[in-house]
Amino acid sequence: MRASLENGDDHDAHRLVDAGFRPPGRPRAARRRAFARARRGERRARGTAEDRHDVPGAEQPVLRDDAKGARRGGRVDRRAGDRHRRASRREQAGERRRGHAAEEDRHPAREPDRFDGHPVGRRVGEEGGRRRRRGGRERERPGRRVRRLEEFRRGRDVVRLPREGDRRRRRSRDPRRHPGRADSRARARLPRGAREIPEREDRRRAERQAGARERARRHREHDPGAPVAQGRLQRQRRRLDGRAVRDRGVGPRHQAHERRRRAGGDRGDAEAELEVHRDVRAVPARPDSPRDRHRAREEVGRQCAEGDSGRREADRQGQREDVQLVSGPRDEADDMDEASGAARAPDEASEEAMDTILALTGITKRFPGVVALRGIDLRVARGEIHALLGENGAGKSTLMKILCGIHPPDEGVIALDGEPRRFANHHDAIAAGVGIVFQEFSLIPELNAVDNLFLGREWRGRLGLRERARMRRAAADIFARLDVAIDLSAPVRELSVAQQQFVEIGKALSLDARLLILDEPTATLTPAEAAHLFGVMRELKRRGVAMIFISHHLDEIFEVCDRITVLRDGQYVGTTEVARTDVGALVEMMVGRRIEQSFPPKPRLARDAAPVLEVDALQVRENGPVNRFALREGEILGFAGLVGSGRTSSALALIGAKPARVRRMRVRGRPVCLADPAAALAAGIGLLPESRKTQGLIPAFSIRHNIAINNLGKHRRLRWFVDAAAETRTTLELMQRLGVKAPTPHTRVDTLSGGNQQKVVIARWLNHHTRILIFDEPTRGIDIGAKAEIYQLMRELSARGYSIVLISSELPEIVGLCDRVAVFRQGRIEAMLEGEAIEPNTVMTYATSDVRGANHEHA
């Protein structure tokens, strides 16, 4: 055998390689040459000149593997035997195919007609195989036509063989996707009994189409013009994806008939019907281009801004009558203005409608178990300051959150500049030009004012780096317009509450919004700071910016606003102009009743009553002033002054929540050292903080847990367990006593209104039997009705022997509620006013000047 390999006997070498023989001891180069000669002989024995597509006698090229092996310096592939075995199997398959081809030549009549001029040899060749080149190597395998032909001869059900190029067409094989032209290949794969399935589907589809034509014929007999117009209207609505406005209560077809009836004619043609449907806020049929679709949407928005017809017009008429009854009699000049307005030309009316920047129509919002808004309508003109009034829980904040994209409306349309809009999130509202200053701060305490101002929209240069200097200059310009001094490098948590409010306002102004929503912006501002804000608002008004102003201070409403819209219990009450109403009428619209007196009468207190709290020396900061004062039993002592004058700092240092340089005091004649709030709590002193949501309550807890958290040992069972039933009974008693409006004691406290939340904080201290209470801005963010309840509650507590310190920025509260007033200025008590001396002018004089009064007492 070795001799045959050395002599180059290709036939013997081929047999040995097929058997897997690997001759040992042979030089590598000799083995390589022997295997190369064996493979060349195999190719010559397997194929013909025609199959190889070259002329007879031509020398065969060296295979890529052999050439690669030669370049490698004679290294022999160890898997050559496996390759030769595969080659022999391919040769046997070729012999079988050649036998089939010879059988076909002997019986040409058995070839089916459905080949349609595409003989098998066209794809198969004489040997019946397909030649492929992969990696420079010739391979042969049976073609697809040969396999299908073999299946046909074996009796399988083959409808037709695929033609040339079917592999590249990639058509769907599911007849249901193309019912008009079912794929025959998919039907060919079905069993014989299931071939009528596509035909059955075709019959059913034809029956459905016939039924639709019959219904259309019957409908045409009833109303000849309706089917075409109705079909077009449906296509238009589908094309708008639900953006077309539909009138509530009455369908478009009924309105079309009503309009035709009032017009005095019965036009039955399709174009007249389509014209009527266009009046019902449809767009022109089949827009030809995106520009036409854009014009169609503008037309829809313009019609939205002009107002609804039918029931909406009647509702507004009734609301105008209600507002006229509330506002009182009108003079002849008003009647003449109304008559002239009624006689205006249609062009002027349309110009006024186009001046509307915001139109809310039928806004309805439902939450689990409650309907927050019911069909709210609101119109805001360009360059107008529009006030939105209502009690806590009336739906003002919910309506503004819908307008800002925080909550989606369940019903209704929002039209901005005459175009229907639907905001998916708050970023969409900002991009549309809607800015808002929330009642709760949306600032990040760890960032400074500049970063909070441009958070999420930082200015970046060419390399993507933030332009800090440019943003800092812009922030400085914004705060200069607000006329407020803010440290731009300090974190926001180190700023006062009033400064944080100005940062919120500056953040909204930096958006260049065309519609600005201000939700209680003056709640933390002094009158002077509020006056600065009103000046900024008037400047924005002159620039054409529309503003929605939400406030519980009616004097601010009458000072800066143009029109007022009132909500009550989630429903629209009415809209009136500021010049045509008064405070009493607005309060009655908000509350539903007339409030005669806000502040309860002051009792007469004995001047020689024993003090319950005596502060001998209180120095908050180093080298600062030292204050002394006393608090009597059953007295309401007011701390008045501007924001930053030291009122809140003194109160926090009093209970140990803030460090103090000097703190000497006595409680009921006994010296105490209040180093922390726990010591103050043990001494019977409690604080109702300025921000009740972040400092006074745990929002995720229930009413019962918030009330009982200061006194967990009161209802203890078996020393380690809390008696939940006893806590619930105590909570119910306090809720009834203070008038907390909530379904159950287990209601989450963050779902309550501001007034009820403040009552929960008061109930916590009453549960602890604390006799000295410090109220820091107790009526901030509370409507006028809840304010009256808080005032009455404070007076009742003082009548029961509770001593109260009231810190407030509202002069009417200080003057109307306090028995004595300590006026602070720059951390010092400038004056102690009592009795008739408590007047607004006197308080402001001591708060803003360096003059001390003759009645400057500290006891």
UniProtKB/Swiss-Prot annotation:
Domain ABC transporter: 358-594, 607-851
GO MF term set: ABC-type D-ribose transporter activity; ATP binding; ATP hydrolysis activity
Region Disordered, residue ranges: 1-351
Biased composition (Basic and acidic residues): 8-17, 44-80, 89-129, 137-167, 193-214, 239-250, 263-281, 288-301, 308-323
Known catalytic reactions: D-ribose(out) + ATP + H2O = D-ribose(in) + ADP + phosphate + H(+)
Record-stated family: Belongs to the ABC transporter superfamily. Ribose importer (TC 3.A.1.2.1) family.
PANTHER family to which the protein is assigned, alphabetical: CARBOHYDRATE TRANSPORT ATP-BINDING PROTEIN MG119-RELATED, D-ALLOSE IMPORT ATP-BINDING PROTEIN ALSA-RELATED
Name of the protein in question: Ribose import ATP-binding protein RbsA 1
Originating organism: Burkholderia pseudomallei (strain 1710b)
Gene name of the record: rbsA1
